[in-house]
């Protein structure tokens, strides 16, 4: 295993992350949420009755602070892990989601939803327009990645989650991660963007345009009105074949196929259905099936001679059985429109981001090359954002984020487990000044349900702390002035210190809360044993 950049040590992974081997989450079920009222789009148009398909793995803790949102790629869906009843194959990111895996469902509640515009349960062009009673087709309004994120936000709010512990995704899923932190910075603590870009390039737009033209030039597309009729399978299959080439690398194609020829005498030419949206074991078995029939004879006609041809043909054909052609048009268009630069500056575009970032590239990815991930990190760090860059060394190309279990798991675990005080502290807190009365402080504690009140000076600097126990003693001793009961030798922490340090101080001094201060001794938050337990109570 090799990982470049960052401060992580791959060789130490066994020491850092020992324990049980990851297991499947088991049987899961899909759920569907209907957004009430109308849903506004970036284009200015609206949709009614928007539905969002989603799956949830693991349980939310008491204050719902352990939720991780997974964003899927172009043709993925909400089924990221586990098995549906009767299925033999698990979700598309099974390698990292489940008990004792990187996204540990014993610790986190993991949610994945199908994007707006998709065809796997969420509202898209194949859905029924409530105004006409017919399929939307191309009357469905053009959407953007921002629209997708806005729909996800509606779901997250519906579930009662105020802040996501993390948002993660690869490829177009990575675009959604970036958009989340730009649109809703206060709602995301940690962001994991894998094999993605902050601004779609001309080459990437070109591949999308060719794929769309393959679909719209298919006579059976019929202007997008093919529902209940024969689908534009030829165009959709060709679009998928074109797209899938960009997911592989030259080295991976050489290793998988070389110039091996296909035995065309067989009644069926073996092939695979493509990797995106599939788990690693399924991908491996499909590729192996290609190698089972090899010929050294050239056909001297236009039937597929080479195994790579068979692979792409069957990949395209099988894709038409699970995906809607119009959805492909809309989603690739949304990818084309994606550009987080503001006034031509990505630094300006990221100016409001506050989440801690892990940006991962893949060494052999030529669809979203490493330099694009490096540009993201540079723009983030220019804004003072804590952003870490890592590169997965792999010959699998863009698809490596679905295949490289070892490297990916190490990076994810390392990033998620590196918890600082700033990740847990409460930035909405109440304070008092030392000239306040006991009565005022007591009423404030009762009203706001808090047991600790930091005492601050006029310029916001920490002077001490008062607890509910101090108030109780003051009442018993008939003390009226707050200044008489303040603890002045108060323990505190800084926001960039590890949460383990805060926890050890609490344990050593038998206290349940610590003020968080900045370099000028001004209070900026408070961390409590309750908040630590709420997020990490299941960790051991």
Swiss-Prot record:
Where does this chain mainly localize?
A: cytoplasm
UniProt-annotated catalytic positions:
171 (nucleophile), 365, 398
Q: Can you tell which superkingdom this protein's organism belongs to?
A: Archaea
Which PROSITE patterns does the annotation name?
A: CBS (PS51371)
Which biological processes are named by the entry's GO terms? methionine biosynthetic process
Domain CBS: from-to ranges: 425-484, 486-540
A Pfam cross-reference name: CBS
Q: What is annotated about its quaternary structure and interactions?
A: Homodimer.
What is the designated name of this protein?
A: Homoserine O-acetyltransferase
